[in-house]
Amino acid sequence: MKYVKARVFITLKNGVLDPQGKAIGHALNGLGFASVGAVRQGKVIDLELAETDRTKAEKEVKAMCEKLLANTVIEKYEIELK
């Protein structure tokens, strides 16, 4: 069976405070990486779907994001199909 692979990038929406990103930036500066300015942190989810129709696969992944993978109140997501 053929599969469609999907990668979902989930990040905080602009304007939402990112304490983890701030902590990472502070730690990098403390390690001597002085050129690092603002840091935003997110997550990447890789999925393999038993689907041959890319349009159906994208629609299904979007539904997954809306229902579970992303908190759409504070997060945005981007889907990349392979």
Residues covered by each model-derived region:
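Long, contiguous binding/interaction regions
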Residues: 1-82
